[in-house]
């Protein structure tokens, strides 16, 4: 029992904690792109926290469309500025926000794996209640933690027209099974109980069940060598939804957990992660030293987007 508590506490330290900027990652902003504009737009979550978001756009964006972007665990929406800018440069207006417990948003912690779906539900409820967005065609694009919510959101908001889910886990339970395999299998029950108690309404959603009876146009993108959201999630979705004409699958190779990146970007990102882990062990580093460390990497190359994948994404989003 003592060891079980340690395991659960270790899991809490990853999935039930706050994620703030500790200056060991670089984040692009709208100011890094000429003519790129943003407008602050915060909303209250059902948990009572203020979630900070922004509308991003270029001049002459499509006024009949809105894309909501849902980020992965921890780093907040600015970790996806390249993706957001890519969507906006194609003519879309994008609303992106930081989840509960992340960066600019309130909350003592991220409140577990299902919180992204809870937040996205609150986000869309807010948008739908705002007259300035009345009648808009709304799509959702998400990655990882944000792709779990993207995969399941049509069960809560059937009017969503299109989704693009990149590297999304199909359910909280399936992810717990993968985190706690082999000798750790015995701790699944305790961890799943934690997730259920943290988010009883949203922790039982399963993407196959959510999409089976949905007419949302869906593009589900995975990488065959993803070690975080493994190939099995793709296989579960493919087996359960392959007969659905509104759902399309894209499986790429050698992209790890970032299927929309170039292969070179994925390799550079792995080099950075190893260097960051080594740098983080140094004690009492100064702000200047951290800035110098980050400046030694080519962040444009490290976040370079794969044009072939984006052609698929835009073909899906643009489809009438």
What is each model feature region?
Residues 245-320:
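C-terminal catalytic histidine-bearing segment of alpha/beta-hydrolase fold enzymes
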Residues 1-44, 51-54, 276-290:
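An N-terminal hydrophobic leader/cap segment in hydrolases
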Residues 84-106:
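Conserved alpha/beta-hydrolase
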Residues 214, 220-222, 226:
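Short beta-strand/loop motif that positions the catalytic acidic residue
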Residues 216, 230-240, 264:
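Short alpha-helix in the alpha/beta-hydrolase fold that links the catalytic acid
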Residues 73-85, 99, 232:
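The serine-hydrolase catalytic nucleophile loop
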Residues 10, 152-200:
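Hydrolase active-site cap/lid region
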Residues 110-131:
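Alpha/beta-hydrolase active-site loop
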């Amino acid at each position: 029992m003592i060891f079980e508590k340690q395991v659960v506490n270790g899991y809490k330290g990853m999935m039930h904690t706050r994620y703030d900027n500790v200056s060991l990652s670089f984040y692009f902003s709208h100011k890094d792109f000429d003519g790129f504009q943003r407008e602050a737009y915060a909303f209250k979550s059902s948990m009572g926290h203020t979630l900070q978001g922004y509308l991003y756009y270029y001049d002459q964006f499509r006024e009949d469309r809105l894309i909501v972007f849902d980020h992965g665990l921890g780093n907040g929406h600015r970790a996806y500025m390249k993706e957001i800018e890519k969507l906006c440069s194609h003519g879309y207006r994008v609303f992106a926000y930081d989840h509960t417990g992340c960066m600019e948003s309130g909350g003592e912690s991220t409140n577990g794996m299902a919180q992204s779906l809870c937040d996205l539900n609150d986000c869309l409820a807010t948008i739908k209640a705002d007259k300035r967005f009345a009648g808009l065609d709304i799509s959702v694009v998400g990655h990882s933690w944000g792709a779990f919510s993207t995969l399941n959101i049509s069960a809560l908001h059937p009017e969503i027209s299109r989704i693009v889910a990149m590297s999304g886990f199909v359910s909280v339970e399936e992810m717990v099974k993968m985190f706690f395999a082999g000798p750790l299998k015995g701790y699944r029950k305790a961890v799943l109980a934690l997730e259920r108690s943290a988010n009883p309404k949203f922790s039982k959603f399963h993407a196959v069940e959510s999409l089976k009876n949905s007419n949302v146009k869906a593009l589900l993108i995975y990488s065959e060598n993803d070690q975080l959201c493994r190939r099995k999630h793709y296989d579960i979705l493919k087996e359960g939804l392959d007969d659905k004409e509104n759902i399309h699958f894209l499986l790429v190779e050698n992209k790890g957990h970032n299927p929309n990146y170039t292969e070179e970007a994925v390799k550079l990102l792995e080099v950075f992660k190893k260097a960051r882990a080594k740098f983080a062990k140094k004690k009492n580093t100064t702000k200047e030293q951290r800035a110098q460390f980050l400046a030694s990497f080519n962040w444009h190359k490290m976040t370079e987007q794969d044009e072939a994948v984006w052609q698929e994404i835009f073909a899906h989003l643009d489809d009438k």
